[in-house]
UniProtKB/Swiss-Prot annotation:
Tissue: Ubiquitous.
Low complexity bias locations: 318-328
UniProt GO cellular component terms: nuclear body; nuclear speck; nucleoplasm; nucleus
Organism: Rattus norvegicus (Rat)
Lineage per the UniProt record: Eukaryota, Metazoa, Chordata, Craniata, Vertebrata
Sequence positions bearing Phosphothreonine: T148
Residue positions, PTM Phosphoserine: S35, S118, S120, S146, S311, S318, S320, S321, S323, S427, S438, S548
Protein's UniProt name: YTH domain-containing protein 1
PTM annotation, UniProt: Tyrosine phosphorylated.
Bias (Polar residues) ranges: 63-90, 186-197, 283-292
InterPro entries: YTH_domain (IPR007275), YTH_prot (IPR045168)
Amino acid sequence: MAADSREEKDGELNVLDDILTEVPEQDDELYNPESEQDKNEKKGSKRKSERMESIDTKRQKPSIHSRQLISKPLSSSVSNNKRIVSTKGKSVTEYKNEEYQRSERNKRLDADRKIRLSSSSSREPYKSQPEKPCLRKRDSERRAKSPTPDGSERIGLEVDRRASRSSQSSKEEGNSEEYGSDHETGSSASSEQGNNTENEEEGGEEDVEEDEEVDEDGDDDEEVDEDAEEEEDEEEDEEEEDEEEEEEEEEEYEQDERDQKEEGNDYDTRSEASDSGSESVSFTDGSVRSGSGTDGSDEKKKERKRARGISPIVFDRSGSSASESYAGSEKKHEKLSSSVRAVRKDQTSKLKYVLQDARFFLIKSNNHENVSLAKAKGVWSTLPVNEKKLNLAFRSARSVILIFSVRESGKFQGFARLSSESHHGGSPIHWVLPAGMSAKMLGGVFKIDWICRRELPFTKSAHLTNPWNEHKPVKIGRDGQEIELECGTQLCLLFPPDESIDLYQLIHKMRHKRRMHSQPRSRGRPSRREPVRDVGRRRPEDYDIHNSRKKPRIDYPPEFHQRPGYLKDPRYQEVDSFTNLIPNRRFSGVRRDVFLNGSYNDYVREFHNMGPPPPWQGMPPYPGIEQPPHHPYYQHHAPPPQAHPPYSGHHPVPHEARYRDKRVHDYDMRVDDFLRRTQAVVSGRRSRPRERDRERERDRPRDNRRDRERDRGRDRERERERICDRDRDRGERGRYRR
């Protein structure tokens, strides 16, 4: 009995020691893996020593490693070689200690239920995710566990696995507080699975220990143990169901991987930035990552990566947090068909053709409404300074590209091409103007063709600088800032392609505009469609400055010479060899060269210098012209020929020919006379009001003088009348006095 009471006291002291040392603080929310690992190692070493003692004593007082959650403080007290003592024949103090122990167990059971519910609810979101790397790791951990009863090694491995798993996944790092709350209860859930598998493998031995313990347990302890075992059985059933679900999901995942291998996908769906373990978790078939964190495992991983020819499929755990990278990375990694690639390549080549030799201008808008209006109507208005600049660029450049950006938006809103110069007087466009600015301050309206209506963030163009704006980033600039050709081209190519735009029509417009502009301004060479005219075959009228009208020519048909009434060409009529005058003309005193090529003033001067014309018929040749006194040398000889010898041998022309020739050649003179008269009339009409004004101005002083003289005469007459009246009055008064 003395030995039994001593053993009972030792057991109670062990239980109290476990309670005081191993119960974690429930309010502590931080998880320290090192301190937890130290506690687990102490606990494992105690269990190992106690088990060895129980084997040495041939299981006289065997202990039980009950299948309970390690997170419960009850498991540590039950598994530490507990001595079951009946309450019969105990003292009052011992009985009170037993009651205190039972109340503490019940409290801990209630706390464990709450913690278990919270931990299970925190794990559910991870199970519902489509990616299943965490489930595969759990299965691999269960396979990799050895059946050895060394609890300290298993617990250390589990802690290392938890640490490496948290470092591999950014999601698990974000949710480390939830995992920490699970660990605060005293141990990790994975060690619970290790104890369960150990109990399954050593089932026979545990059954014997349980039978011996039940025989020795008291009534109160049996009730507590039965309640705990029922809860543990329920938890085991839940865990088995979870494990079955995990195994099914693992099989589905492995089947998917086999299908992908059979299809022979030789491309890498992994982004270059996701190679680091902190962003993604990668898997390989036939390999298990235990996450032990040792150097050997790291070397094996590196060797596997070098030996592998096909890149592994990497599952991005970031989920919905990658909202910005969705548009870029999703399109990069999706496998495009050859037709889609060809269409995009064709679009890029067309865009490069449009941007070739273009001029680029940055357009800054004050609000999104104006840009939306421009996208809808295809028009734009700017200040007169920029309007003049854009008009000059449109005339000189092949294309003018406007890159739009709303102030303080952080993005470019698209780019368009000018399709016309600015025009005024059309239907007004209701722009949204800032305070203090009226629509009259804007210039004309440009028509534009949009090339891309999609947006481009400034962050995508941070590497581009504008040499024409002091090498500042291309996003910086005032409204109308011109961008250098290479910089503008690269900026436009950064925009996402806009499939709603038909670049073929835009190219057609460009060619039409270039053709229209090339026709009026041919640079030194005639166009292909314009007939080439030989410069050497120009008519002499083209060189005549004074001859603004085309002179009539008489071109006779070849049969004209055989007519019976044929007369010689009047252009070759006889010319007086002495005076070089055209004979028998109406104005015969005018020289031929003056008559043909001289101006009207020369003609009038010659006409006034000569005498009156001769009569038409019945008179000797040249009777009205005074013959100059003959030189003695020419008295008996004919005078020498003059300047035009070919005309000297012709005979006199009859009157009909002279009249016909006169009708032709007098046309010009009649026109000149008509113009002179009309000009005189018009100038006279214009001069008449001037002359009237001058006459009025001249007459004004005369009229003023006349008026003044009249006024003076009237004043004189009035004074005379007054004087006469005075004299009369005086005379009459004198008469009355007498």
